[in-house]
């Protein structure tokens, strides 16, 4: 208890996947939580435990829900490096899962600034705050945007083994970031096009591209 009371604050990083498929858009912090996958269910449990410590012991927590963050050094299983690595390895026909789900994508630098701004805020203790761009793009259109940025004519093959189970797939994510904008000075610097260009330039370096095995499905 003494240690807890000496802490200035704790930021708990959650995920937009705790909201499940959008019941309304944009998705605000009041949206009921839905565990559509073991990952999101585990994050919901962690979120609720953190809130319980705030309510029971006044632990100074702030709970942050970033929507999809991307950038250099991202896991090979994420959609943007999956697309870019296949294209950089000479493929013009790439393999993806479902093309219809939409995602709200924030460049990693902007997400980090959002975390810092939430930390600096004098409010938001014991509350949830979204971080996202309030903009969505489908997986299919994202792949085409990346190909256009790389000046590549692209064909997409949707492979069944890459498609998430129907009841697990989050079909639509679009962030309501009004709470973040109200309580902080957050001002994202990167458009989707700028962020994608940063990732492409980083992945072009052979020592970086070697981390990504485009010939296999990373799960």
Task: Put a short name on every predicted segment.
Residues 108, 163-187, 194, 198:
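Conserved C-terminal active-site "lid" loop/helix of NAD(P)H-dependent oxidoreductases
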Residues 72-77, 100-113, 128-148, 188-193, ...:
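Substrate-binding strand-loop-helix patch
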Residues 83, 87, 112-119, 143-146, ...:
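Hydrophobic "lid"/C-terminal helical patch
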Residues 1-69, 190, 197-203, 208, ...:
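N-terminal Rossmann-like NAD(P)+-binding domain of SDR-like oxidoreductases, especially those catalyzing
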Residues 44, 69-82, 90-92, 108-109, ...:
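Glycine/proline-rich active-site loop of Rossmann-fold NAD(P)-dependent oxidoreductases
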Residues 44-51, 55, 81-84, 113, ...:
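Conserved active-site helix of classical SDR/Rossmann-fold NAD(P)-dependent CH-OH oxidoreductases
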Residues 98, 127-129, 138-143, 151-172, ...:
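C-terminal "lid/loop" region of Rossmann-like NAD(P)-dependent oxidoreductases
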Residues 57-60, 84-95, 121, 149-161, ...:
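A short C-terminal helix-loop "cap" of Rossmann-like NAD(P)-dependent dehydrogenase/epimerase domains
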